């Protein structure tokens, strides 16, 4: 039925004057779309680890304690890189508590989230999990209460091949070969007063510089992520400038974090958060360029290593946010911003993976997939390897003293497949938008594949046994191409990926 509707809508529009235009040009590239944009995050928080990806003794778990049903859902999600162990948790975490025989690991009071930590899941369990799901591991060191020695010893434990104390401890714990962990975070949100071991920018930069030096002396091949500001109510720009200027020769990324909300119950305002996301990226990109003003600058990129919708569930609910259809639309908004800035945003990690502000929810009998799960999968799959500039002219609405187009667009290109992907979020609550899609270079063929999320109830959610209603539809159509362009209607409050072929 969906396919028939798509044909009828497209055909009916041919006689109309389109309200919007999108121009694509395969020669106008932005940069490579890094696979690490499709990452995720696993923190010791609520039921993210225990009862989420790991549940010893469960009939749904394997002999190592990993939930196999969850693992299959995670594999299908396409997680390219997984950040661990936090988050706020990392600022009070002693990684040595989480290695060795499980029955001998200490139970600790966990200060960040006011819980008890059994430490039955630690470094080896995490790294084996990333191997099982095919993801790069990304470890965040304790930049709050931790020391430089803690950080370098952790690198030695995971990456050293010679017979050293910590490498031999790894062997004793059942792993002979190094894990070769490439990505390391130099602490989490250290600018935030809520953080254990909170520091000002100067003190953080001194710590991070010494940690980077010591960690790279253990393994010179690692990539390091500085803790960018997440405290947007303070001088976040000044923090990032100070950190970048101090660490410009020692880091590979600086982090950004953003959580958005729809407390005002205003869809168009909610989906207009892209204004701020673009601003955060572009302002930080400017600070990077300023720090690189000297000769032979080291490349530095942005790791957007925490992002999501989060405002309903708090600590009392263990952050178990129930997502709806409008939140699924917001996933497209975030990814469109990341793709539009693919030259500088080279990593992104949705927070988080299971149960805690997550696309996957579990109980002891099984799981269900939240509506946000599906756009995450498709943005990772339905894409080219290069981001394109997409020129957009569309009806607008006023938000934060600026005119914002109702359609939010990004585009990617695969030269190998002659495929152009056009990602379009229609932010309008009520208006379908007829759009002429114009190709500027090469010949546009009439073959179009369509992936789309559209549902009448913006607040529709999923639950156990009922997670098949707010799901994407796929179809193909034969477009009426005229002058290297065609018209397509993007339904109100919808997210669409069009796959075009350009010869």
Regions found by a protein language model. Give the residues of each.
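Active-site His/acidic residue clusters
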Residues: 257-273
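Hydrophobic h-region of N-terminal signal peptides that target proteins for export
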Residues: 7-16
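Sec-dependent signal peptide recognition
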Residues: 1-7
């Amino acid at each position: 039925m969906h396919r028939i509707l798509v044909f009828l809508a497209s055909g009916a529009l041919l006689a109309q004057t389109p309200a919007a235009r999108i121009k694509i040009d395969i020669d106008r590239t932005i940069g490579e779309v890094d696979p690490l944009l499709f990452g995720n995050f696993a923190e010791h928080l609520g039921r993210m680890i225990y009862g989420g990806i790991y549940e010893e003794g469960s009939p749904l778990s394997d002999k190592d304690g990993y939930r196999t049903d969850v693992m299959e859902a995670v594999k299908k999600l396409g997680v390219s890189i997984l950040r661990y162990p936090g988050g706020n948790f990392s600022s009070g975490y002693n990684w040595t508590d989480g290695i060795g025989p499980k029955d001998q690991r200490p139970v600790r009071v966990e200060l960040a989230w006011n819980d008890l930590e059994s430490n039955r899941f630690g470094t080896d369990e995490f790294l084996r999990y990333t191997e099982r799901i095919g993801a790069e591991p990304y470890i965040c060191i304790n930049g709050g209460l931790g020391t430089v020695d803690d950080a370098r010893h952790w690198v030695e434990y995971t990456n050293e091949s010679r017979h050293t104390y910590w490498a031999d401890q790894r062997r004793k714990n059942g792993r002979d070969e190094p894990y070769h962990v490439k990505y390391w975070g130099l602490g989490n949100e250290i600018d935030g007063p809520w953080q254990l071991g909170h520091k000002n920018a100067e003190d953080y930069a001194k710590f991070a510089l010494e940690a980077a030096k010591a960690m790279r002396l253990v393994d010179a091949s690692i990539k390091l992520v500085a803790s960018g500001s997440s405290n947007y109510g303070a001088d976040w720009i000044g923090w990032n400038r100070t950190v970048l200027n101090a660490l410009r020769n020692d880091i590979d990324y600086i982090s950004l974090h953003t959580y958005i909300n729809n407390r005002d119950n205003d869809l168009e305002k909610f989906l207009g958060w892209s204004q701020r996301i673009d601003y955060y990226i572009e302002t930080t990109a400017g600070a990077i360029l300023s720090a690189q003003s000297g000769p032979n600058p080291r490349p530095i990129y942005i790791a957007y290593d925490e992002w999501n919708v989060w405002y309903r569930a708090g600590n009392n609910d263990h952050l178990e946010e129930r997502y709806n259809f409008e939140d699924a639309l917001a996933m497209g908004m975030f990814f469109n911003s990341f793709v539009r800035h693919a030259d500088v945003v080279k990593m992104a990690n949705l927070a988080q993976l299971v149960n805690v502000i997550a696309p996957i929810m579990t109980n002891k009998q099984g799981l269900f997939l939240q509506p946000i799960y599906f756009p995450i999968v498709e943005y990772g799959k339905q894409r080219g390897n290069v981001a394109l500039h997409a020129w957009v002219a569309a009806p607008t609405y006023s938000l934060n003293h600026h005119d914002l187009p109702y359609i939010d667009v990004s585009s990617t290109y695969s030269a190998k497949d002659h495929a152009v992907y056009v990602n379009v979020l229609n932010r309008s609550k009520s208006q379908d938008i007829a759009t002429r899609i114009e190709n500027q270079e090469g010949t546009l063929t009439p073959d179009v594949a369509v992936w789309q999320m559209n549902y009448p109830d913006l607040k529709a959610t999923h639950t156990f046994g009922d997670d098949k209603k707010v799901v994407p539809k796929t179809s193909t159509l034969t477009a009426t191409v005229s002058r290297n362009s065609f018209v397509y209607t993007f339904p109100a409050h919808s997210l669409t990926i069009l796959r075009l072929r350009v010869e």
